[in-house]
Amino acid sequence: MNPIVEFCVNNLASGADAAFAKLDADDNLDVIEYDCLTYCDLCATSLFALVDGEVVRGETAEELVANIYTFLEENPF
């Protein structure tokens, strides 16, 4: 079973789309897009994804990707 990375469609429109594309190309991750993750305050102010249910943030799409991989290294299955 792969780690699950979840994105809000509104956050993708705010700039997380590049992170989504990069992570989606990784066969070791299950990357999912949802209409809403109910983190509207967070979604309006920063780029983020839920990684196995935990919030991971980044100031840029590149930082978000790096932070997600760091989170996965520090929190293996």
Swiss-Prot record:
Transmembrane segments: none annotated. InterPro entries: DUF1450, UPF0349. Belongs to the UPF0349 family. NCBIfam families: PRK13669.1. This is UPF0349 protein lmo2392. It comes from Listeria monocytogenes serovar 1/2a (strain ATCC BAA-679 / EGD-e).
